[in-house]
């Protein structure tokens, strides 16, 4: 991989001939194009009889037509031989004859199996959302072939269905995924405005190191950077909560480096969210729940419906709402001797979301497609309680400032997809625009300096307007070549991508930053506001084939040019050898790249508590360079993956994947300074620091570390049939993960950039092991899911707030949070064929993290380690759920 400084620092964005004003069709990924819906094509089939699932996959391979089906629906069914000259529909009709299954085709040619009510045999046991079934799903992530199952992939891929998401008892996509996939984690709680956004980590790395796609198209990042400390500090990852769960068909999580395939950010892996494409039917759902402590009541509802549009079109619509009240998990405030400081807990959230996925065939060889999401979210996050003595004439009983966010998040993709371009090329031309726009405010606060000067102060402030946008244009082409010496076709893909990124910080109102600003969090001053842009041009090549019937290989290369960093070239080589149907070995090696986000380069802030102020200086600012900061550089990575895939029994699937990720020039929270040096730097950066604080410190984002993360992922599924007592779908998931600090970079003043606390955030704030065992039992109308998860200990280096080391930035309190076990239970009942009811409990035994030692519990009330990525401190959560399908 090479980085070259560009001769020109700006390149005008490419203008693509894609001007769409109508709704269009969607498909999981361009690389799986089928013949357009309006075209009838006769093909030659030669498929032997066997399991129906294998017959269906053979139809996919020989016709290059995607077929979406749940393995659980075809489990145990036999498929006939399919031979002769037939259309795809005729072949599928033969395969499904007598099975009780039918099929429908959407506008982009994707075929979906469904039960034919009049023919379907009545099962003696109900069908659960089996993990074994999802393993047989044809996947579209990490491959550009049309017939790859999760169990046959060259890299480890988890497939999570919408039903599995719902059965976690949460309407938050991030929280649902974390419950189901041990390789995903999140920090316990963020502070200040960072608490307003959800983020997730994969394999113990930063949220910045996982790429999120929707239907295979790059998703924009949040505009709200996390600056509250911990592993996720400095991250601007994708907020999955902005995508309505009702719109999701399934989610594919690729646990392997994929920068050579998808570009920047895909260092730890890729999360690809596949939207629903049904042209009929739908559901209405409602869920409600509350924590065992009696707070945090939440409720939500969703509607999804599919419509046929004309002869070949479809429109799938989703709408969703959710409201969540705040929680309080604080200890006794040593200043008052009472409980109730609300700053330790979840914020209050109100959220409304919409999504559509639509399309139609224009001609026999041309399709339109389009999909979009829109989310409006308001959040209110309580900050530290302020004493009555501060402003007695305004708040005689004291006050609790609340940071607020009024956020709009939206994304629209539109494209054209066709076949037989210049002969046999399948092609896809698309444009995606996405934006996140949170307006941050402060309520129930004061400007103390203004109050002392004039005797009056506003109580409500506009702190800042943030905006992050991303406009991505793609041209992708694919063709399969028959090569004489190869047993299967050579799949050749190539494409171009142009992307324009923008990050904007708008100043707050005058009194939000005047002379120290609003209490808890001052607003952005004009000196720290601004707008920054970046343009990216890239191209890729992708080859895959079978060298023998058992040995498949794939290689990819990608070149990208950044207007502000120069050029990068990354590659990936993957291979898999199946010794027999029961044993397979897979491996990959790849290089990766991640450019620093525009927010990491340019964001400045100051957080103020009753006794402490902590600032963040923009890494590229003159103020940060006073302290020795340097311009941020791209992060570079090398990934290795070695996996063993075992299918010893027809109902048992096991995958063991060992991995290593080496990161150079990792962007971390470092370069910490305190006292007058920090105050001078903050003032130079346009930040006014309040007087009378016990401690003032500041830091900046920096390429401060080289790290190596290595570990093992284990997944296993097994189906137990209990004759007349139903069946149990077992799922085991485990992640063993460790990150080592290879190099702590040295600052210009000769000091290491990372102190002990910041090193611990990277190396030990995430559990080194997380193991989950799930049993999903079903019989007739009843279903029961029990999930047990073990989290190993986490280690943090905590601040001292009392004693001789109080507020030190060099001496820390070593703290170990012991291993924890969480138990989740859900009981389901199908009242009718359409109505399903559920009641459940997450963390049924009300397990919480260990409490902090008194000397590190800020003012007594902050008695949990909010930097750890282990378990939530909210405790048991009880819920009910109802789904009506039609």
Task: Identify the function of each model-found stretch.
Residues 111-114, 146-147, 157, 177-223:
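Extracytoplasmic beta-strand/coil segments of soluble accessory domains associated
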Residues 280-283, 293-383, 388-397, 401-414, ...:
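Transmembrane beta-barrel wall of Gram-negative outer-membrane proteins
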Residues 663, 738, 788-802, 829-886:
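C-terminal beta-signal and adjacent terminal beta-strands/loops
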Residues 399-413, 420-422, 433, 445-553, ...:
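Outer-membrane beta-barrel transmembrane domain signature of Gram-negative proteins
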Residues 217-255:
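Short acidic/polar hinge/loop motifs at secondary-structure boundaries
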Residues 653, 658-800:
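Gram-negative outer-membrane beta-barrel transporters
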Residues 111-114, 173-176, 180, 200-201, ...:
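N-terminal periplasmic accessory domains that precede
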Residues 56-62, 114-166:
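Short, acidic, small-residue-rich periplasmic hinge/interaction motif at the N-terminus
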């Amino acid at each position: 991989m090479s980085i070259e400084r560009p001769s020109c620092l700006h390149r005008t964005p490419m203008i693509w001939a894609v001007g769409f004003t109508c709704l269009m069709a969607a498909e999981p990924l361009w690389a799986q194009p089928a013949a357009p819906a309006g075209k009838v094509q006769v093909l030659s089939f030669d498929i032997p009889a066997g399991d129906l699932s294998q017959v269906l996959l053979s139809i996919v391979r020989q016709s290059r037509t995607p077929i979406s089906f749940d393995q659980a629906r075809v489990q145990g069914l036999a498929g006939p031989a399919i031979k002769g000259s037939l259309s795809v529909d005729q072949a599928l009709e033969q395969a499904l004859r007598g099975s009780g299954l039918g099929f429908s085709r959407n506008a982009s040619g994707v075929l979906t199996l469904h039960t034919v009510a009049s023919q379907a045999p009545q099962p003696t046991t109900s069908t659960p959302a089996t993990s074994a079934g999802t393993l047989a799903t044809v996947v579209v992530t990490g491959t550009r072939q049309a017939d790859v199952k999760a169990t046959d992939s060259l890299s480890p891929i988890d497939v999570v269905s919408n039903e599995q998401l719902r059965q976690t008892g949460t309407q938050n996509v991030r929280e649902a995924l974390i419950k189901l996939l041990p390789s995903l984690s999140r920090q316990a709680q963020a502070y200040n405005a960072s608490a307003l956004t959800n983020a997730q980590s994969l394999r113990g790395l930063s949220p910045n190191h996982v790429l999120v796609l929707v239907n295979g198209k790059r998703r924009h990042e949040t505009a709200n950077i996390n600056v509250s400390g911990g592993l996720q500090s400095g991250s601007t990852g994708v907020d999955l909560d902005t995508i309505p769960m009702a719109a999701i068909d399934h989610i594919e999580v690729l646990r392997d480096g994929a920068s050579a395939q998808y570009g920047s950010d895909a260092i730890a892996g890729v999360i690809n969210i596949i939207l629903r494409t049904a042209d009929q039917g739908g559901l209405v759902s409602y869920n409600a729940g509350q924590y065992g402590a009696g707070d945090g009541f939440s409720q939500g509802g969703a509607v999804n419906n599919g419509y046929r549009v004309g002869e070949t079109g479809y429109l799938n619509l989703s709408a969703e709402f959710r409201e969540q009240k705040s929680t309080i998990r604080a200890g006794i405030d040593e200043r008052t001797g009472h409980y109730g400081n609300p700053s330790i807990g979840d914020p209050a959230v109100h959220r409304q979301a919409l999504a559509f996925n639509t399309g139609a065939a224009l001609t026999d060889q041309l399709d339109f497609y389009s999909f979009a999401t829109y989310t409006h979210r308001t959040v209110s996050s309580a900050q530290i309680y302020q004493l009555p003595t501060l402003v007695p004439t305004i708040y005689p009983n004291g006050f609790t400032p609340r940071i607020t966010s009024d956020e709009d998040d939206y994304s629209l993709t539109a494209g054209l997809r066709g076949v037989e371009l210049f002969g046999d090329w399948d092609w896809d031309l698309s444009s995606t625009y996405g934006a996140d726009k949170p307006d941050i405010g402060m309520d129930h606060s004061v400007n103390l300096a203004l109050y002392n000067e004039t005797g009056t102060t506003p109580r409500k402030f506009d702190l800042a307007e943030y905006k992050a946008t991303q406009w991505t244009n793609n041209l992708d082409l694919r063709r399969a070549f028959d090569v004489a010496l190869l047993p299967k076709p050579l799949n050749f893909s190539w494409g171009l991508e142009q992307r324009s990124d923008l990050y904007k910080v708008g100043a707050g109102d005058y009194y939000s930053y005047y002379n120290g600003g609003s209490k808890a969090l001052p607003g952005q001053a004009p000196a720290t506001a601004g707008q920054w842009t970046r343009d990216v041009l890239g191209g890729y090549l992708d080859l895959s084939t079978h060298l023998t019937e058992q040995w498949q290989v794939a290689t990819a290369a990608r070149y990208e040019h950044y207007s502000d960093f120069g050029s990068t070239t990354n590659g990936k080589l993957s291979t898999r050898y199946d010794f027999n149907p029961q044993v397979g070995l897979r491996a990959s090696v790849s290089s990766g790249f991640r450019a620093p986000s525009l927010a990491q380069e340019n964001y400045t802030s100051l957080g103020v508590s009753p006794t402490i102020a902590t600032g963040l200086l923009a890494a590229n600012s003159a103020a940060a360079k006073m302290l020795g900061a340097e311009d941020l550089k791209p992060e570079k990575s090398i990934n290795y993956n070695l996996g063993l895939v075992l299918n010893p029994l027809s109902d048992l699937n096991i995958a063991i994947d060992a991995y290593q990720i080496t990161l150079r020039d990792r962007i971390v929270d470092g370069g910490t300074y305190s006292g007058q040096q920090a105050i001078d730097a903050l003032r130079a950066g346009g930040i006014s620091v309040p007087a009378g604080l016990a401690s003032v410190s500041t830091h900046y984002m920096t390429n401060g570390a080289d790290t190596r993360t290595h570990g093992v992922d284990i997944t296993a599924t097994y189906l137990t049939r209990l004759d007349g007592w139903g069946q149990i779908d077992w799922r085991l998931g485990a992640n063993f993960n460790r990150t080592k600090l290879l190099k702590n970079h040295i600052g210009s003043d000769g000091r290491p950039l990372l102190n002990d606390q910041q090193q611990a955030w990277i190396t030990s704030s995430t559990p080194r092991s997380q193991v989950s065992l799930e049993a999903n039992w079903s019989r007739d109308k009843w279903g029961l899911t029990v999930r047990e998860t073990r989290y190993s200990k986490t280690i943090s280096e905590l601040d001292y707030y009392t004693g001789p080391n109080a507020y030190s930035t060099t001496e820390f309190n070593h703290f170990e949070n012991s291993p924890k076990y969480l138990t989740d239970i859900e009981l389901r009942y199908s009242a009718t064929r359409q109505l399903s009811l559920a009641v459940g409990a997450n963390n049924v035994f009300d397990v919480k993290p260990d409490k902090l030692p008194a000397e590190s519990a800020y003012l007594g009330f902050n008695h949990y380690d909010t930097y750890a990525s282990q378990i939530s401190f909210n405790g048991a959560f009880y819920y009910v759920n109802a789904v009506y399908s039609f």
